[in-house]
Every structure is written in C-alpha cells, then in structure tokens.
C-alpha cells in the first residue's frame, strides 16, 4: 500500500495496457484501428469506475500506453498518436503521452533506440499539438526548446495574418 495514493488531492495516471495479465509482452496483435477503439473502451470503463469510486473529475490523467503496451505493430501506436484529439474530445480529461525512444518510432524510421532523439522529438511535438497535456520525455531540454520555438513561430504566424487582414477573429 502506498500512502501517497490515499491523498485526496493527488492526481492519478491511468495507463492503457493491451495485455491484461502478467508482464507486458509483444504478443498482442490486431488492426491499428482496434488499438484506438480498445484505448477508448478502456478509458471509458476506467473513467466510469473512477467517478463511481468518488474520484474528483479533474483527478485523473489518461495515458494511452504507446509502443508495445498497445501492440507490437507500429501502425497501432501511429494510429493512436494521430488520433489523440479524438480521444481527448471523447473523454474530456487530460492526456499524458510517452513516445520517447519507443520501438514503434525505430520501426518507422529504421533506426536503433540510441538514434531516436529526432523522431522522439517530432512525435512529442505532434502529441502536444494534437491534445497531449503532458509528455514524458528522455530529453526535457530539447523538448522545451522545440516548444518555445513552435510557440514563437505560432505568434509570428498570427501576427502576420493579423497584419495582412487575414485574422477574422
């Protein structure tokens, strides 16, 4: 029993795991879209149980469990990663995404884990831009710099649109 779990104002992370029993393995198979549907069903059940147990509405963070936690097929993680906004909209809770150095990145770009820094950063920026509220990373400094640059670029894009009369908001 962990005493910190009993703290009422402590947020919890609920992570999806395709394999229900034992240690995670690379044996779970299925179609990529089944991964997204499975994550959605798992989270719906988790949120329902959380609320029935009296959990605070804002006390749960959802983690789709990227990589082999979903499936050994890289397409499954790619499908979930490309649909984060759909998950977030359906569930209305914050998302935590952990894609740093995951095997599905290596399978996609054809590189070993030690060389996945750029692919990890690209996947992390994609996740942030598509609904992830939290990102677990192996390179926090690189991610912070990339976020700062992206935010600065977005400000310039907005300012340029406004200056040209393209901003109708």
Q: Where in this protein do the model-derived segments appear?
A:
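Active-site-adjacent loop and "lid" segments of alpha/beta metabolic enzymes
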Residues: 1-2, 12-53, 58, 68-169
């Amino acid at each position: 029993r962990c005493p910190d779990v009993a703290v009422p104002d402590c947020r919890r992370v609920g992570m999806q795991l395709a394999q229900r029993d034992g240690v995670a393995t690379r044996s779970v198979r299925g179609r990529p879209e089944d991964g997204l549907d499975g994550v959605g069903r798992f989270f719906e059940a988790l949120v329902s149980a959380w609320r029935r147990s009296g959990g605070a509405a804002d006390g749960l963070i959802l983690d789709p469990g990227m990589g082999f936690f979903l499936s050994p097929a890289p397409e499954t993680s790619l499908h979930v990663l490309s649909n984060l906004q759909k998950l977030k909209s359906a569930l209305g809770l914050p998302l935590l995404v952990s894609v740093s150095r995951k095997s599905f990145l290596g399978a996609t770009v054809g590189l070993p884990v030690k060389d996945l820094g750029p692919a990890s950063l690209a996947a992390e920026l994609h996740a942030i831009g598509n609904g992830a509220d939290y990102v677990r990373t192996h390179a926090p400094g690189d991610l912070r710099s990339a976020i700062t640059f992206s935010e600065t670029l977005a400000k310039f894009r907005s300012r340029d649109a406004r200056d040209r009369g393209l901003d109708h908001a």
